[in-house]
Amino acid sequence: MPTVDDVLEQVGEFGWFQKRTFLFLCLISAILAPIYLGIVFLGFTPDHRCRSPGVDELSQRCGWSPEEELNYTVPGLGATDGAFVRQCMRYEVDWNQSSLGCVDPLASLAPNRSHLPLGPCQHGWVYDTPGSSIVTEFNLVCADAWKVDLFQSCVNLGFFLGSLGVGYIADRFGRKLCLLLTTLINAVSGVLTAVAPDYTSMLLFRLLQGLVSKGSWMSGYTLITEFVGSGYRRTVAILYQVAFSVGLVALSGVAYAIPNWRWLQLTVSLPTFLCLFYYWCVPESPRWLLSQKRNTDAVKIMDNIAQKNGKLPPADLKMLSLDEDVTEKLSPSLADLFRTPNLRKHTFILMFLWFTCSVLYQGLILHMGATGGNVYLDFFYSSLVEFPAAFVILVTIDRVGRIYPMAASNLAAGVASVILIFVPQDLHWLTIVLSCVGRMGATIVLQMICLVNAELYPTFVRNLGVMVCSALCDVGGIITPFMVFRLMEVWQPLPLIVFGVLGLLAGGMTLLLPETKGVALPETIEDAENLRRKAKPKESKIYLQVQTSELKGP
């Protein structure tokens, strides 16, 4: 009986139907970009100072320039460690009193300004920006600055929680239904975020968007890889992730054109509604239909693929079946990932690598956005490096292998982070170059580890292994905003030190993994244990006691 791959070899592994469907689904990948990294613009924190009643009137009466107003009324100017004082403290002075002159008005109150009492901001802040962000609208600065971190962490928390439930929905009710449902919720929650009346409701809508957006991306990823033949699956998977990079590049331009965070959020959310047209444009996965014993529907879709590709369907198409062993199946458990020495080692290393690449990727972007410069151009330049990163993967993955390029990329990200510590502020171009090098390294690792993770586990625990290890990616995303912004308050280079240590450790630990280039996917525990060495004699094979499907109810 022919399998889906057998039929695709005859009707086209990547014909007109697959190309059209791929382009449709790439919109889902691009839409994830502003959800994942839109915080750079939505949560942009401009320079700010306390609003003091009477200062505007005095400045207008005296005809001060903006520089003179700052010099006369804001504490902490010129001090190397005066950022907090300048942005979060104010002189406890009544600026409405008539005795204040126009030239150094505070001189009449104290011979030295350092003797004047300071107090926290009580009347809001003045922001030096023509646009708006969630920071300027909800005053998320000083004591409330951590709320910006929480805003971003909620997205990653949603990714973490949603990927578990959405995966079940996709397997139980179908890829297409899961894609449409998550897309609808994603679009609605994005619009609700844009019109949220307060910080709390905005946070809840953002969490809801995180719960479904990554699941929507994963559903699109699964659909397109199940529509193409095995020879194109890896390339299509990488190019699907390139669409995410296209979304990042577009985001920098849209954010520049729309400096108001509410209109920006609305603009990047509305295109998601277009994906609802997938109901008519994208069919269900024939592989999933076969797994649900809906063979007639699967045959109709394969026949449609043949027609769209201009090919004749095979004569035995009606006998289409899944290419899988229908005999006894093993039921994996979490303990199986740690039960044997090599599986245990691989699991711990992969979990650390997923965590590290998430911290480096997101952390370098957030750090660059928080350290001055033109945030739009900096984000644009660093997004462009993701395209050569994809090219490097396509060129090296079957020529050089997986492990050495991945280790080198981790090391490059770590070294670039360490060098950034010593770059003077006036060499901003060098800061951008090093940030781009680090981001390129993290991008390569983030895309390659998906493949390596699957290739190191035996068949019956492969999906579980990928799910458990990749969950650390979302855990890294949850803590990264706090790691970047709060550590910068302690000492600005401190996040870069953490990034450097993580990158160097990850580079070394990657070399402890076996190379999987040209190696068949392990089917058994013994295969996974012996990836580095020749098979042992039969009597020394490792067996695991696992449950079988017979032990479960119908």
Swiss-Prot record:
Disulfide pairings: none
Annotated membrane topology: Multi-pass membrane protein
Positions in the Extracellular compartment: 43-149, 198-206, 259-262, 369-374, 424-431, 486-492
SUPFAM superfamilies the record matches: MFS general substrate transporter
Annotated control of activity: Phosphorylation of the transporter leads to changes in its substrate affinity, resulting in a regulation of the transport activity. In contrast with rat ortholog, ASP uptake is inhibited by protein kinase A (PKA) and C (PKC) activation. ASP uptake is also endogenously activated by calmodulin, the calmodulin-dependent kinase II and LCK tyrosine kinase. Inhibited by cGMP, most likely through a cGMP-binding protein that interacts with OCT1.
GO cellular component, one term: basal plasma membrane
UniProt superkingdom: Eukaryota
Segments crossing the lipid bilayer: 22-42, 150-170, 177-197, 207-229, 238-258, 263-283, 348-368, 375-395, 403-423, 432-452, 465-485, 493-513
Reaction(s) the record says it catalyses: 1-methylnicotinamide(out) = 1-methylnicotinamide(in); dopamine(out) = dopamine(in); serotonin(out) = serotonin(in); (R)-adrenaline(out) = (R)-adrenaline(in)
Glycan-linked positions: 71
Motif annotated as Proline-rich sequence, chain positions: 283-287
Residues in the Cytoplasmic compartment per record: 1-21, 171-176, 230-237, 284-347, 396-402, 453-464, 514-554
Tissue expression summary: Expressed in kidney, liver and intestine.
InterPro entries: MFS_dom, MFS_sugar_transport-like, MFS_trans_sf, Orgcat_transp/SVOP, Sugar_transporter_CS
Pfam families assigned to the protein according to its UniProt record, in alphabetical order: Sugar_tr (PF00083)
Post-translational modifications: Phosphorylated.
Extra information: Involved in the uptake of clinically used drugs including diabete treatment medicine metformin, neurotoxins 1-methyl-4-phenylpyridinium (MPP(+)) and iobenguane and platinum-based drug cisplatin. Also involved in metformin efflux transport. Metformin competitively inhibits OCT1-mediated thiamine uptake, leading to a decrease in hepatic steatosis. Plays a role in the anticancer activity of cisplatin and may contribute to antitumor specificity.
Domain commentary: A large substrate binding region with partially overlapping binding domains for structurally different substrates is formed by several transmembrane helix domains (TMH) including TMH 2, 4, 10 and 11, and it is alternatingly exposed to the extracellular or intracellular side during substrate transport. Contains one proline-rich sequence (Pro-Glu-Ser-Pro-Arg) that is required for transport activity.
Protein's recorded name: Solute carrier family 22 member 1
Source organism (scientific name): Oryctolagus cuniculus (Rabbit)
Gene encoding the protein: SLC22A1
